[in-house]
């Protein structure tokens, strides 16, 4: 997406050899207008996939996921990091490595929110090494959801 590329070039900062800092507009301070355009683009690319849920991981992916969900008119489910008393034991869980923090986190999604047959679009704020997405795919597989990988068009 050209608009995101331009924003990264203008405001992104490279830290070391392998980190792109985008907290000025994406995950510390959020440019909602930019997220709306990103949400529209996700809708355009995945419009024919009959998405009925969007799955992300807390915390930075929630903003993009929520705005995108408005365009699909579907709920957002997010994997919670760590143990939570209000989630209970009826969960799917996996371990996800955070590239930027250098730590592993247990993430969980209640079994009430992912079901077999769901058509789930995974959204995250940024792709470092794919660990968050791989963890979310693992959770979906645990739910025995219908797994259909559709790659977006490049245009």
Residue ranges, per PLM feature:
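Short, glycine/charge-rich flexible loops or terminal/linker lids adjacent to PRPP-binding catalytic cores
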Residues: 74-120
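Short Gly/Thr/Asp-enriched flexible loops that form oxyanion-binding sites at enzyme active sites
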Residues: 63-72
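Short glycine-rich phosphate-binding loop at a beta-alpha junction
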Residues: 51-58
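Conserved small/polar residues in nucleotide/adenosyl-binding loops
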Residues: 147-153
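Gly/Ser/Thr-rich loops at beta-strand to alpha-helix junctions
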Residues: 58-63, 129
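Active-site-facing substrate-recognition patch
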Residues: 1-51
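Active-site/ligand-binding-proximal alpha/beta "capping" segment
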Residues: 128-142
């Amino acid at each position: 997406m050209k608009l995101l590329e331009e924003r990264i070039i203008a405001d992104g900062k490279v830290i070391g050899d392998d980190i792109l800092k985008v907290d000025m507009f994406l995950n510390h301070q959020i440019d909602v207008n930019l997220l709306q355009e990103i949400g529209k683009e996700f809708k355009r690319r995945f419009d024919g996939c009959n998405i009925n849920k969007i799955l992300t991981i807390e915390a930075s992916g929630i903003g993009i996921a929520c705005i995108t969900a408005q365009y699909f008119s579907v709920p957002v489910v997010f994997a919670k990091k760590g143990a939570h008393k209000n989630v209970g034991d009826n969960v799917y869980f996996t371990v996800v490595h955070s590239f930027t923090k250098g730590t592993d986190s247990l993430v969980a999604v209640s079994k009430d929110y992912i079901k077999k047959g769901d058509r789930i679009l995974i959204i995250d704020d940024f792709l470092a090494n794919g660990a968050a997405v791989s963890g979310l795919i693992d959770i979906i597989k645990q739910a025995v959801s219908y797994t259909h990988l559709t790659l977006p068009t490049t245009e």
